[in-house]
Amino acid sequence: FIAYVGIFLEKNSTTKQSLIDLENIPFVTVAHITTGKFNIFCKVRARDTKHAKDIIFMIDDIQGVLRTETMISLEESINDKKRLMHRIFNEL
């Protein structure tokens, strides 16, 4: 399944290294630097809830991470990549 993890950092200056460390976790598939509540917002793919917990603990272990907040995706309702690809192929 898919989960989204908002990451709170101790300091903004740790953002670059935190992203490097996130890149070393293969189950983190997307990461964004964001404004607002979180410093970094990422997408995680997990096999099950235990696997998701393990991934979240890996993220929590990154130096500079203060805490995380996780949201589990119940359903993908809109996927612009899929719509865009269908449109491109239909125009060919």
Predicted feature locations:
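A compositional/biophysical signature of low hydrophobicity enriched in polar/charged and small residues
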Residues: 1-92
